[in-house]
Amino acid sequence: MNNNVEELLRRIPLYNKYGKDFPQETVTRFQMPEFKLPALQPTRDLLCPWYEECDNITKVCQLHDSSNKKFDQWYKEQYLSKKPPGIVGNTLLSPSRKDNS
């Protein structure tokens, strides 16, 4: 198998992509434009917006949690305070017997 590959490669004519006069000629040097990277910002300046965003998210979460507490307080004052104690306190309400004496 290896011999077949070598024979196949030997049949392919070799050529120089720079032309037949390449070793004597000098190839023109490619001029690449110079580019500059922007200066790096200090880490504190880069992370400051992230810290602010995390603080805002924390505040929104606390506000959401406190709104549930406000609703629970309102529900107790407006609805549960008007119900009989047996319904609110999960105690068994049993009817009392009338004494016909």
UniProtKB/Swiss-Prot annotation:
Gene Ontology biological-process entries: ATP export; endosome transport via multivesicular body sorting pathway; negative regulation of protein-containing complex assembly; protein targeting to vacuole; ubiquitin-dependent protein catabolic process via the multivesicular body sorting pathway
Gene3D superfamilies recorded: 6.10.250.1830
Residue positions where N-acetylmethionine is found in the record: M1
Keywords: Acetylation, Cytoplasm, Endosome, Membrane, Phosphoprotein, Protein transport, Transport
Keyword Acetylation set for record: yes
Assembly and binders: Component of the ESCRT-I complex (endosomal sorting complex required for transport I) which consists of STP22, VPS28, SRN2 and MVB12 in a 1:1:1:1 stoichiometry. Interacts with STP22 and SRN2.
Function: Component of the ESCRT-I complex, a regulator of vesicular trafficking process. Binds to ubiquitinated cargo proteins and is required for the sorting of endocytic ubiquitinated cargos into multivesicular bodies (MVBs). Appears to be involved in cargo sorting and release of the ESCRT-I complex from the MVBs.
Protein name, entry field: Multivesicular body sorting factor 12
Source species of the chain: Saccharomyces cerevisiae (strain ATCC 204508 / S288c)
Organism ancestry: Eukaryota, Fungi, Dikarya, Ascomycota, Saccharomycotina
Gene (name only): MVB12
